[in-house]
């Protein structure tokens, strides 16, 4: 996935992908049930993508134009910086978009870095199934440079970290992340978050709010 990447991603082996999947499912299982009568389903898109032949890929590629792809902000930045854009990166939004078609979804939820990919799926759903698909894009926590926090960037707080490490990582965040951190990573009511934002703006010491944020995240 080239989303939000200034350079091509490092290619992973299938074994690495499967191992990452196990880790993500393990972390997600703290919030989502993968067993029982109403369990969440975990699907590999190889279930349908592996069945596609080259004719199918060409047919799918005919649903979008190069101009549409080049309007993507990440590709615009690469072009301006004279960095390469590979064909497989062009194909990725189509492949992810086709996941929606294959599963016949009604709604897709993802981080706002996935908006282009999810809207590609919406367009494909319209053209291939004459069906509307709704997209919900959620905020992502970004560091002081505007780069989203994640595994690739090495600046995330992992659910697998010890409470001490999680606390320390949050305390290392810039003050600008305090309010977004409360909004995105805690269950505090928004009126309390807005109140803290106003207090910080009036000159209150941000450190005490950051300590409270770290406690909320760790608990």
Positions of predicted regions on the chain:
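Amphipathic, alpha-helical segments enriched in basic
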Residues: 3, 50, 69, 75-78, ...
